[in-house]
């Protein structure tokens, strides 16, 4: 390889991070590494007591002046702005025959959980939502308007957490639902656990089939097991579905414009169905049960391949990847790397903890 391999790591000095978001490395040709709540402070009457001033300030922070619109039979989840901690909180409404409410935690550990409120509309009307602490103090207040039924152009989401996230992100006219037209205008959906604490509650991607112009979709730490709703999103260029229990990815074979695909930390074992993805420049199946990577021989544009912590033992298919720049294959069963010998663009190879590889 005549010095083209700048880093060949055979023993534990360099490890790539577990979360690789299908990004390109810095190369001589490409220097890019590719890959309010407004606090409402009210004027306080100077003649008032210090106690009343404190109360006014509390309510200015705790009350959302915008009315939340919901629809009968279509629960949503909203963030309540409650602090972390073990203190118990309760959610209720001014008329629970019209709408009920319940607290949901983003984590089983209350010390770190973000508390959300699920609103369950029963019949049309108006109520006030109250979130109270263990002493009965109101920490959050929200006006709720319940309308009878969703308009016909509403996206038929099956998952409350996903619907609630997209309602916040793409409901451009604040009418309480995401229309098919609105969702078709969305180009990026990025859901990390650290950015959307309810990601663990997302179980169903139904409805995303209407995101026809979606180019980037990142789903981290969800409970999704079926990616079939993504099969028609042919404009997708970057797809990350990591740390989930998906096993079947055959429906992704239609996504012929994909350039970056990250399936790290999933339960997949077979990637042979990805043969149509000839535009991929980055593929990550890190920490999966994949054992055969021969499908990559058809991915002539591939520059970055991440197969660490898999059962892969044969990398002969990589010999066809004339544009490959990086191969990360730590903790695999690889025993022969002769397939790499003629890859003139290969600059980075990581083979830490490959016990079958002779020194």
Functional labels for PLM-detected ranges:
Residues 80-84, 121, 157, 220-221, ...:
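Non-cytosolic beta-sheet module surface loops
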Residues 131-133:
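Conserved structural position at the C-terminal beta-strand
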